[in-house]
Amino acid sequence: MFSLAVLREAISILRGIGIVESRHGSGNYVSKDPGSSISMMIKAMLALKSTSKAEIIQVRKVISYSVCELIMDRGLTKEEVADFQSILDGMITASKEEFAEYDRIFHRKLMLLTDNTLFRTLMEPIGEAYLELIPEVIGHTDADSRKALVDIHALLISGLVDHDREKCKAYFEKHYGFVEDGLEL
């Protein structure tokens, strides 16, 4: 049997890491957004240099490939393909700042298509940390480089539509190679 003091301490720790939230006069509840605590932890790890940009990219690459595997298993609807094409069209004419936002929208849409709440909860904070690096990468690009990035993103959609794992793998090598070069890793 636990003492009340031990239970309070455990709840305090869970609240501190964002898993539990306390509502005055109502009690303690499991947080609806545990991903935010993971995101804060990743940012702290970066600030304390206990992780690196390269490690974030490595984890993101593995997770992104898993996202694509799940999407290939379920397939893309014509409407989803059209949505991605609209994002790609926006990327073509976008400024550097707008391009980074379109990239965020593109990758978030991929993540949401997994239809897996736990996967999204785990991936979103890593994606946020990764996407904070994108403006730095885009900042080093010219119009031709951004056009090449649009083509790389189009390759992924083509791979997903065709259920072609090799195309998707080629996308990941090109995309993350571009990111690593932009961050000079």
Regions found by a protein language model. Name each.
Residues C68-D103:
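Exposed, interaction-prone assembly regions rather than primary DNA-binding/catalytic cores
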